[in-house]
Amino acid sequence: RRSSDLAQDVLNGVLANSEAIDARISEYAIDWTLERMPAVDRNILRVAVYEMFFAAEKLVPNVAINEAVEIAKIYGTDDTPRFINGVLGKMVRSDV
């Protein structure tokens, strides 16, 4: 598959499941509302949550978290990778 097809599938999946994805993020992003969260952080979390819990071909959580953290290092602030790792890590640990 072309990467553009994969990107479109992920975007469509995030949009189709946005309420459930945002509810899950809100549950684990303690002291952060989605509105207060930087857009980059919020959208990295949305993609990772979709890939781990909602996609037809789910990613192994460690792979999804590592990808999200690497993207956060490029596009986020200095605090973004730690924040992303913390939220997703809590989510995965509680989902076991």
Regions found by a protein language model. Give the residues of each.
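Short, small-residue-biased leader/transition segments that mark boundaries at the very start
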Residues: 1-3
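C-terminal non-catalytic interaction appendages of large macromolecular assemblies
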Residues: 37-38, 54-96
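Short alpha-helix boundary/capping elements
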Residues: 15-19, 53, 92
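PIN-domain endoribonuclease scaffold, especially VapC-family toxins
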Residues: 20-25, 29-31
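Short amphipathic alpha-helical boundary/capping segments
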Residues: 31-37
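SAM-dependent transferase fold signal centered on methyltransferase-like domains
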Residues: 42-53
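Membrane topogenic helices and adjacent juxtamembrane segments
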Residues: 7-9, 13-22
